[in-house]
């Protein structure tokens, strides 16, 4: 459960990210593919080379979904229901991959905003990404 302090940290961080969310999403996705090569199996039709337009575009989709979630911290299941359906029923993404991408998102944000990435912000973002991952995998059961 996200506390009021977590929600404030998440919103403040997302405000600082601003227009870079899509860029960071693409970078985090590239980092995920490089660090965890098995995640590439879900994208056989993509050019997965560094700087690929397809990876950047999908990274922007990830960032857009997270931006939507930031705007609905009190109702993540409602906000992400369609995305949960897509990943569970159509794409059938292994739930562990959300954890791997979440880790790479944290690393990417820490690299770009080291001064703002305090232990409290790190913990809040980790809880947020875990909450989003939980919602996205909730329909697997």
From Swiss-Prot:
Residues the record lists as binding O2: 58
Gene Ontology biological process terms, A to Z: hydrogen peroxide catabolic process
Positions carrying N6-acetyllysine: 16
Example of a GO MF term: oxygen binding
Entries under Gene3D superfamilies matching the protein: Globins (1.10.490.10)
Positions of modified residues (Phosphothreonine): 108, 134, 137
Residue intervals of the Globin domain: 1-141
Protein name: Hemoglobin subunit alpha
The organism of origin for this protein: Procyon lotor (Raccoon)
Lineage, opening ranks: Eukaryota, Metazoa, Chordata, Craniata, Vertebrata
């Amino acid at each position: 459960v996200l506390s009021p302090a977590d929600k404030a940290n998440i919103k403040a961080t997302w405000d600082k990210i601003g227009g870079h969310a899509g860029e960071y999403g693409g970078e985090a996705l590239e980092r995920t593919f490089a660090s965890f090569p098995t995640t590439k199996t879900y994208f056989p039709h993509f050019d997965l080379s560094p700087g690929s337009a397809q990876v950047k575009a999908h990274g922007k989709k990830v960032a857009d979904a997270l931006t939507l979630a930031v705007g609905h911290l009190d109702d993540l299941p409602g906000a992400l229901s369609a995305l949960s359906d897509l990943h569970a029923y159509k794409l059938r993404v292994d739930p562990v991959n959300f954890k791997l991408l979440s880790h790479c998102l944290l690393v990417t944000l820490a690299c770009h905003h080291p001064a703002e990435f305090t232990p409290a912000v790190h913990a809040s973002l980790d809880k947020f990404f875990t909450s989003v991952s939980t919602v996205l995998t909730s329909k697997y059961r």
